[in-house]
A protein has these predicted regions:
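Non-ligating segments of multi-cofactor redox enzymes
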Residues: 1-177, 186
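Structured cytosolic domains appended to multi-pass membrane proteins
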Residues: 175-195
């Protein structure tokens, strides 16, 4: 963890903090490259290969979600606003030792993410439930991934419509519909389980 070594908040709160300071620190560079510009090329590949929360959740036994996707994705917007308001309030109230608070927010925030993620995975029997419904970072990733250069597409000449791709997808993406307009087209994490 670079954040622990550098004592810097690498989560979304750290991005807001350094952005408001006008500082080009590791968190702002990380978000700019991996989560704002990166999805234009790799979609949500970050989620499938580099996200530390997703990596821990993938160790759980619920790799193939059994249930349909719930309609509670609005929670990610609430989490996004909470992270933004948390940092704004630190500036408004001129909190002392803000660097120390941001570092502890990084540690505590990660623990909370893991606890919520593991609890949701067990409750919904779905490793990636946190990613689908709670993760505020997807607010950055989803719009850019809509225009992603790298996409998994269905070869309709070989497809026999067995739906194995859908049944193996941890994000419930319907790969039969490979148009950019598919409802869940920005959800693909390029895990390649469908291939």
């Amino acid at each position: 963890y670079l954040g622990i070594i550098c004592r810097e908040n690498m989560q979304i709160e750290g991005f807001w903090y350094y952005l408001f300071l006008g500082a080009f620190e590791a968190a702002t560079i990380h978000y700019l490259i991996a989560k704002i510009l990166g999805p234009l090329f790799f979609g949500r590949g970050w989620c499938g290969y580099a996200c530390w929360t997703g990596a821990i959740l993938d160790l759980l036994p619920y790799k193939k979600p059994k249930n349909k996707r719930l309609k509670i994705g609005f929670i990610r917007y609430i989490m996004f606003m909470i992270s933004l308001l948390f940092v704004v309030s630190l500036f408004i109230f001129r909190v002392q030792n803000i660097e120390k608070i941001m570092f502890y927010a990084f540690i505590i925030g990660n623990i909370i993410y893991y606890l919520i993620g593991i609890s949701l995975a067990i409750l919904l029997k779905d490793n990636r439930a946190f990613c689908k419904y709670i993760c505020p970072v997807t607010i950055f990733l989803k719009p850019a991934s809509y225009f992603s250069y790298l996409r998994v597409k269905c070869d309709h000449t070989k497809c026999i419509k067995c739906r194995k791709c859908l049944n193996s997808c941890p994000m419930n993406v319907d790969m039969l519909d490979d148009s950019r307009k598919r409802i869940n087209g920005t959800e693909c994490i390029l895990c390649l389980n469908c291939i």
